[in-house]
Swiss-Prot record:
Sorted UniProt keywords: Acetylation, Calcium, Metal-binding, Motor protein, Muscle protein, Myosin, Phosphoprotein, Repeat
InterPro entries assigned to the protein according to its UniProt record, in alphabetical order: EF-hand-dom_pair (IPR011992), EF_Hand_1_Ca_BS (IPR018247), EF_hand_dom (IPR002048), Myosin_RLC (IPR050403)
Keyword Ribosomal protein: no
Organism the protein comes from: Mus musculus
Highest taxon listed in the record's lineage: Eukaryota
Domain EF-hand: 32-67, 102-137, 138-173
Tissue: Predominantly expressed in adult atrial muscle.
Record-given protein name: Myosin regulatory light chain 2, atrial isoform
Pfam family, one: EF-hand_5
Cited Gene3D superfamilies: EF-hand
Additional comment: This chain binds calcium.
Length: 175
C-alpha cells in the first residue's frame, strides 16, 4: 500500500512539474508570437493530428524542395522532443533554441533551409511562391513591396545575408 501511494505521489509530482514547465514556455513569448508558432506548427503537422511525426517532417521538407532528407536527420529532430511533439513541446523546443539566440543568426538559419547549396542566395520565384501559399499568406502586392527592398544578385536571386542585415540593423549600412 505504501509503495502504491509513493508511486501515485511520484506521478502527481511529475505531472505537476510538466504542467509548470509547459506553462512557463507560454510566458516566454508574446501572444502574437505564440500565434505565429501555432501557424508554423499547423504547417508542419501535415496530417492535422496535433502531433509532429516523421511523415509530417518528410512532407514539409518535400514542400520546401528537399525531397531526400536522411532518416537519421528526421529521427534526430524528433528525438529533441523526448516524446511526441505536440504544440507545447514544439513551443518549448523553440524557447530553448531561441533563448539567448542572436536574432540575426536565427534569421540566417531560417534562410539557410532554402539554400541547400550554401550559396547565400535563395531563388526569388520559389521564395515568392512560399510567401504566397504558406502560413500568413502574402498578397502579390505585399510580395512585390518586400522584393522592392530586397537585395538581389545578378541572376535575380535573393541575397539573404544582405537582407538579414537590413532586417536586423536597418536599411543603412554602417560606414
Amino acid at each position: 500500500m505504501a509503495s502504491r501511494k509513493a508511486g501515485t505521489r511520484g506521478k502527481a509530482a511529475a505531472t505537476k512539474q510538466a504542467q509548470r514547465g509547459s506553462s512557463n514556455v507560454f510566458s516566454m513569448f508574446e501572444q502574437a508570437q505564440i500565434q505565429e508558432f501555432k501557424e508554423a506548427f499547423s504547417c508542419i503537422d501535415q496530417n492535422r493530428d496535433g502531433i509532429i511525426c516523421k511523415s509530417d517532417l518528410k512532407e514539409t521538407y518535400s514542400q520546401l524542395g528537399r525531397v531526400s532528407v536522411p532518416e537519421e536527420e528526421l529521427d534526430a529532430m524528433l528525438q529533441e522532443g523526448k516524446g511526441p511533439i505536440n504544440f507545447t513541446v514544439f513551443l518549448t523546443l523553440f524557447g530553448e533554441k531561441l533563448n539567448g539566440t542572436d536574432p540575426e543568426e536565427a534569421i540566417l538559419s531560417a534562410f539557410r533551409m532554402f539554400d541547400p547549396s550554401g550559396q547565400g542566395v535563395v531563388n526569388k520565384e520559389e521564395f515568392k511562391q512560399l510567401l504566397m501559399t504558406q502560413a500568413d499568406k502574402f498578397s502579390p502586392a505585399e510580395v512585390e513591396q518586400l522584393f522592392a527592398l530586397t537585395p538581389m544578385d545578378l541572376a535575380g536571386n535573393i541575397d539573404y545575408k544582405s537582407l538579414c542585415y537590413i532586417i536586423t540593423h536597418g536599411d543603412e549600412k554602417e560606414e
